[in-house]
Every structure is written in C-alpha cells, then in structure tokens.
A protein has these predicted regions:
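Secondary-structure transition motif
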Residues: 1-160
Length: 160
C-alpha cells in the first residue's frame, strides 16, 4: 500500500515541509497546513503543523528515483543521465496508445510523466507522448529527481 504524504512550501519562509495535509476548515479564506499526526489507540492528534502555500502542494507518488529519493508530483526527472531528457511528474488523465499506430485507444487516470521538450527528438512522435510512471520505467530510464517546477522553473522551459 502506498504511503499518502504531501509536501508544500511554508508560507512564513518558503521552506519545503512534508507530512499530512490538513484543511483549516474555516469558511472564508482557505488555509492549508502540512505536518505530523500522532495516532493513539483511540485518538488522532495534529502535531507540528505549518501553514503552506496552497499552490505548492504536491502529493508523494509512492515511488523513488534511481538514488532512492522520493518522487513527488511536479518533480522534474532526468532520464539516462542526459540533461536534455527531462520529464515532469503528473497525476491525471492520459492517453493509452496503440504501439503500432500510436493512436489513443483508451484513457486512464494515474501517475504519469510528461516530456519536457528540450531538443528536436523530444518534440517528435512517439518520444513526446506521456507514459505511466512506474517502478519499471524509473529503473529502465534511470530516472533521477533534478528539481521541481517550483524551485527550477528554468528546467520546464527546457534549458538545464
């Protein structure tokens, strides 16, 4: 079973924090917190929660890169040690393609990666298509976390 964790940038200092997600629950201004839960036999208590910028909240995929680092939503991964072979981690709907015709034959919802166009080949079919993010793909492509869309927006533009 996958560990359900979130991370976000603290509102007070921009530092990343990971833990459980807690909605402030008050009407009006939306306030989101991330922190630890203390689980007792009969109780669950929130402990050490910090307010985070809601725009930076990312969910843990349950997967790790080739070096054992957690892969989060919106992370940027480098494949095969090649700085021009970059992908972004995404959760959502994507097309399942027929391997012979490359036409979309189905749609699924789940963790996948989207190609970041950095060179001519990454803009060409079939290399530009989204693929499921699985342990097998991570291992075969030697994927490594090199940043996130929040900390390294220049990587999304395709320049390392």
């Amino acid at each position: 079973m996958r560990e359900i964790l979130f991370k976000g940038k603290k509102k007070d200092n921009g530092e990343w924090i990971e833990g459980y997600l807690l909605d402030g629950g008050m009407p009006g201004e939306k306030r989101i917190f991330i922190g630890k839960l203390v689980i007792g036999k009969w109780t669950v208590m929130a402990d050490e929660f910090d307010e985070v910028d809601p725009d930076t909240i990312c969910e843990y995929t349950g997967l790790t890169d080739k070096k054992g680092k957690k892969i989060w939503e919106n992370d940027i991964l480098m494949c095969h040690g090649n700085s021009e072979d970059l992908v972004k981690t995404v959760f959502g709907e994507f097309g399942v393609r027929n391997i012979e015709t490359w036409s979309i034959v189905d749609k699924v919802v789940g963790w996948h990666y989207e190609i970041i166009p950095t060179d001519t080949i990454s803009r060409c079919e079939p290399f530009c298509y989204s693929m499921p993010l699985t342990k097998d793909y991570i291992d075969r492509c030697e994927m490594e976390v090199v940043g996130s869309i929040f900390d390294n927006p220049e990587l999304v533009q395709g320049s390392l």
